[in-house]
Amino acid sequence: AYNFCPNPINFMHIANLSSHVIDSVAYVEGVIEELKKIKTVWEPPGKATVSGFQSLMSMNLLKNPSGKLAQLKSIIINEIEVYYLKFQNEQCSYIQKFPTTRNLFGWTVILKQQGHQNAHIHSSGWLSGVIYLKVVPPLGKDEGAIGFSLNSEYYHDVNSPSLTFQPEVGDIVFFPS
């Protein structure tokens, strides 16, 4: 049997910026201010963003960051190490062949009313993540939540595992790409 990542939902990891910075509220506000300077596009073609803005994919926000974004890159690298250590004893190729080189690619998404991300994968990545700088209050219908499932446009199984996570400001959510 192929044993790359038998149950990807089991490899989710949730942390928060508050475990990396003293004043996470001020830090998040600073990151948001820096991101306001980044050029974005409304509903970029071929991307998962619906009713929202996304930075240009030609611009990797983590390539040569400065200021708060440089600190954010450092936080991400540290949290990837925490992630790996958490799962290092798992007997699957996803962990046993976990890349030792940290090649990060980052972008920003700003969702507006009724905005969301369509279901998608990051086929060129190994580990993906989201850092929540702003969230909407949940009104009982999973507003602002992130969902995980093995189902897709081309595959659907009602018995397939799924998980919905309601993030809070500062949450870092890692999951297999």
Protein language model features and the residues they cover:
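Non-heme Fe(II)/2-oxoglutarate
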Residues: 2-95, 116
